[in-house]
């Protein structure tokens, strides 16, 4: 085999290796119910993005500067988080590394869940729950005040295909993907998984607070 042929095979091999490695570097997230996103987050706020700019956030292990996008925000309401209002949100500079793009100018309101960084700052990724406020159902908006918190000790298990089962009484089976082929179905929009007095968990529908009779039921 000639040198040119060997070089061509080597180049093709490197291209194949690159194509196999690249997906591992892309942003990949597992779907979560809005209640799970609320419970997993350090901070959950309703806010508008006022401005954005690229900033340095230290250096990597090779000494290269780490770039992040800084959003200056106007917080409208905090549903979960520190006593101090959030003033700045940080994210990666590209969606390929899970960076989030927000509309700036202060017109579009978002529900934003993410990780606290202290001193009025938080960090968000595409794996966090960030949606336009006006896309939330009335039930979701009301559940942010208290109901989601009532079920943070429960486990929401996503059903990817039938059959699927719960393995313990403190689980709620999330069926939206099976029934509607969507992760933003009826259970996401209108239900919360609530812990009851016997320690079990069950789906509760509606915007009104759960009645004592629901909390006291022993069998889901």
Swiss-Prot record:
Q: Which GO terms describe its molecular function?
A: enzyme activator activity; integrin binding; metalloendopeptidase inhibitor activity; zinc ion binding
Q: Which GO terms describe its biological process?
A: negative regulation of cell population proliferation; regulation of MAPK cascade; regulation of neuron differentiation
Pfam families xref list? TIMP (PF00965)
Q: Which residues form the signal peptide?
A: 1-26
- GO CC terms on record? basement membrane; cell surface; extracellular space
Please list the disulfide bridges: 27-98, 29-127, 39-152, 154-201, 159-164, 172-193
**Maturation and modification:** The activity of TIMP2 is dependent on the presence of disulfide bonds.
Name where it's found.
Secreted
**What CDD domains does this protein's entry cite?**
NTR_TIMP
Q: Which residues bind Zn(2+)?
A: 27
Regarding tissue, the record states:
Detected in testis, retina, hippocampus and cerebral cortex.
Q: What induces it?
A: After intracranial injury, expression peaks at 4 days post-injury and slightly declines at 7 days post-injury.
Keywords attached to this Swiss-Prot or TrEMBL record, sorted alphabetically, are: Disulfide bond, Metal-binding, Metalloenzyme inhibitor, Metalloprotease inhibitor, Protease inhibitor, Secreted, Signal, Zinc
Q: What PANTHER family does UniProt report for this protein, alphabetically? A: METALLOPROTEASE INHIBITOR, METALLOPROTEINASE INHIBITOR 2
Q: How does it assemble?
A: Interacts (via the C-terminal) with MMP2 (via the C-terminal PEX domain); the interaction inhibits the MMP2 activity.
Family affiliation: Belongs to the protease inhibitor I35 (TIMP) family.
Which purpose does this protein serve, as stated in its record?
Complexes with metalloproteinases (such as collagenases) and irreversibly inactivates them by binding to their catalytic zinc cofactor.
Name this polypeptide is given? Metalloproteinase inhibitor 2
Q: Which organism is it from?
A: Mus musculus
């Amino acid at each position: 085999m000639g040198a040119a042929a060997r070089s061509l095979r080597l180049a093709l091999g490197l291209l194949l290796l690159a194509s196999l490695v690249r997906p591992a570097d892309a942003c990949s997230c597992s779907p979560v119910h809005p209640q799970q996103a609320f419970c997993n987050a350090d901070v959950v706020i309703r806010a508008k993005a006022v401005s954005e700019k690229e900033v340095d956030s230290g250096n990597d292990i090779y000494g290269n500067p780490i770039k992040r996008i800084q959003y200056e925000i106007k917080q409208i309401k905090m549903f979960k988080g520190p006593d101090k209002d959030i003033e700045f949100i940080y994210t990666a500079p590209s969606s390929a590394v899970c960076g989030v793009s927000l509309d700036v100018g202060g017109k579009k309101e978002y529900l934003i869940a993410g990780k606290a960084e202290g001193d009025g700052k938080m960090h968000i990724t595409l794996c966090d729950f960030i949606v336009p406020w006006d896309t939330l159902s009335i039930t979701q908006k009301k559940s942010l005040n208290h109901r989601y918190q009532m079920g943070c000790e429960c486990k929401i298990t996503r059903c990817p295909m039938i059959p699927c089962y719960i393995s313990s009484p403190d689980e709620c089976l999330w069926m939206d993907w099976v029934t509607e082929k969507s992760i933003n179905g009826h259970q996401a929009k209108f239900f919360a998984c609530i812990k009851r007095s016997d320690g079990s968990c069950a789906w509760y529908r509606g915007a009104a607070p759960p009645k004592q009779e629901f909390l006291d039921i022993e069998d889901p």
